[in-house]
């Protein structure tokens, strides 16, 4: 009996040690070091004209991307396309193709710590909003008079909202399936990963550790606060069956959004990655109608 209790105590100690390692080391890096993804796809493969983009960040990283050119004789505007966590610039090339056919140029790029861009850690908008500001500066140096918008989904939407609050030269935004607060969404993800089990205190501890590792302040990554400063026209969309980011977060962002020119579209039956599949032509028309309103 005593031997069994000893084995049980050792087993429980082992579990505690492994749990501590997970919370202290594994989870924080999982938050700020997503797997790098890139696809063997170039704009020319889709018949697009482009120029390479290499924009330095304020902390001396190089952001890699493409400036996709208009297929029309004139250019009606430019939109910065911002991908989500673990994504890459190539994911947006089909959208860039659609915009190009309408005379709208776009910037597709890899966020820091993603794809071909430099950087070891992502910060969910804390540093990325200033990366967007650097891209805006690059665009305006070459095309100062063209209307400029931003389009982001998931983490890219959170980055876009924070950039819109910071940078008035971005004139409109399209935001799909994004979150309100980094601390909340990290807790949500971990709870889902652990099949319903989750401790907010442990989640916040892992996030605080991630902030120290990646040199940023997680408590300042709050798109719900950013929207209260945004005056530009905004199109918000969310699927009511989103399994990653609750549709209620999209509704909260809309309710707190300062801009009087705002639109919220809830796509019935759409999950985190299926707005266009479930929304069909009707959703696409709503999106493009908004874009048409703010380009030339």
Segment roles from a protein language model:
Residues 85-98, 111:
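The serine-hydrolase catalytic nucleophile loop
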Residues 162-216:
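Hydrolase active-site cap/lid region
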Residues 4-56, 66:
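An N-terminal hydrophobic leader/cap segment in hydrolases
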Residues 278-296:
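Catalytic active-site module of serine/aspartate enzymes centered on a nucleophile-bearing elbow/loop
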Residues 229-231, 236-238, 242:
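Short beta-strand/loop motif that positions the catalytic acidic residue
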Residues 91, 122-143:
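Alpha/beta-hydrolase active-site loop
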């Amino acid at each position: 009996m005593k031997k069994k209790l000893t084995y049980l105590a050792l087993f429980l100690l082992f579990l505690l040690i492994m749990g501590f390692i997970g919370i202290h080391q594994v989870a924080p890096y999982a938050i700020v070091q997503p797997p790098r993804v890139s696809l063997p796809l170039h704009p020319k493969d889709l018949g697009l004209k482009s120029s390479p983009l290499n924009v330095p960040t304020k902390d001396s990283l190089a952001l890699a991307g493409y400036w996709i050119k208009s297929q029309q004789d004139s250019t009606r505007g430019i939109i910065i396309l911002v991908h989500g966590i673990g994504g890459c610039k190539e994911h947006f090339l089909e959208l860039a193709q659609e915009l190009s056919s309408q005379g709208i140029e776009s910037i597709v790029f890899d966020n820091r710590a993603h794809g071909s861009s430099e950087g070891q850690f992502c910060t969910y908008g804390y540093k990325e909003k200033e990366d967007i500001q650097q891209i805006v500066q690059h665009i305006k140096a070459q095309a100062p008079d063209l209307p400029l918008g931003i389009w982001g989904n998931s983490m890219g939407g959170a980055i876009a909202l924070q950039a819109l609050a910071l940078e008035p030269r971005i004139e409109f935004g399209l935001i799909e399936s994004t979150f309100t607060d980094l601390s909340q969404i990290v807790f949500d993800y971990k709870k889902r990963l652990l099949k319903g089990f989750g401790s907010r205190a442990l989640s916040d501890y892992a996030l605080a550790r991630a902030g120290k590792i990646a040199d940023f302040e997680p408590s300042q990554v709050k798109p719900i606060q950013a929207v209260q400063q945004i005056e530009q026209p905004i199109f918000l969309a969310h699927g009511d069956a989103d399994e990653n980011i609750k549709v209620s977060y999209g509704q909260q962002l809309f309710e707190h959004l300062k801009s009087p020119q705002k639109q919220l579209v809830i796509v019935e039956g759409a999950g985190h990655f299926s707005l266009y599949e479930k929304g069909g032509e009707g959703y696409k028309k709503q999106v493009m109608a908004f874009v048409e309103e703010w380009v030339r």
